[in-house]
A protein has these predicted regions:
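Conserved N-terminal subdomain of the carbohydrate kinase-like
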Residues: 1-87, 236-242
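Conserved phosphate/ATP/ADP-binding segment of small-molecule kinases
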Residues: 88-170, 201-204
Length: 243
């Protein structure tokens, strides 16, 4: 499996708790890169988008979807967490992300992002019942949905995800709750999810693998580690590679 990165914005740090990051934007690069890939005759099995800094970048991803219509289209609609938009994102990102999600095969919002896409009141903590209901409604936007960061599973002892498919059965995946919150775990989850699907796993099995790996990353990270700096991803990679 070979990944081709298409940078949308360069940030000196992420936007959570590290002050105001320096931002590098090159709006001409993305369209030029896509045109170059097309001239080369490249074929992509999947197009997966994450953090997008402004609505024009959502349009760039839509352009990629149109150029490679047979690719699996996965969108992590990075908008916010903890009941609010991420710092640096304007309210105009919500309709832009909604439109992008409507062109995807699979979307992976957290409970806050699910509420933003649906126009629901922003949640503090997402219950499993609320997440299941939101996931089902989100299948009107995209045919496959996974809502992450769902608490309240097993009387609060677990955290997990709720999945739904248009016209299909819903499901939930849970892992033991470790009471620590690290930045970047959503990106790790999405990367493993997409990788497992491309290896031929059905979405529920891919979600299970991704959730288990994130849990392992947190377990491998010593308590007291600055949560803003993320998990010790490398320590958990051998177990993922053995699966």
């Amino acid at each position: 499996m070979q990944a081709v990165a298409l940078p949308t914005a360069g940030l000196s740090t992420h936007t959570g708790g590290l002050g105001t990051p320096a931002k590098l934007s090159n709006p001409g690069y993305g369209p030029a890169a896509l045109a170059h890939y097309q001239r080369l005759g490249l074929r992509f099995d999947c197009i997966y988008s994450g953090y997008l800094a402004d609505p024009t970048q959502a349009k760039l991803v839509e352009q990629a979807f149109e150029l490679w219509p047979r690719a699996l289209k996965v969108v992590d609609p990075v908008l916010g967490d903890g009941g609010r938009l991420y710092k640096g994102l304007g309210a105009d990102m919500v309709p832009a992300m909604y439109n992008l999600c409507s062109k995807a095969n699979l979307i992976v919002p957290n409970v806050t992002e699910a509420a933003l896409l649906l126009g629901d009141p922003l949640p503090g903590v997402g219950s499993s019942e609320q997440a299941a209901e939101q996931a089902a409604r989100l299948t009107r936007i995209a045919p496959q949905v996974v809502v992450t960061g769902v608490t309240g599973l097993s009387d609060g002892r677990c955290i997990g995800c709720v999945g739904a498919a248009r016209g299909g059965q819903g499901y939930s995946v849970k892992t033991p709750l470790i009471p620590r919150m690290y930045h970047g775990t959503g990106d790790i989850f999405g990367a493993v999810l997409v990788g497992r699907i491309l290896q031929g796993n059905v979405p529920q099995a891919a979600v299970q693998a991704a959730a288990a790996f994130v849990s392992e990353c947190i377990r491998q990270t010593p308590e007291g580690t600055d949560e803003r700096l993320g998990v010790w991803l490398e320590a958990a990679l051998p177990k993922l590679m053995q699966q």
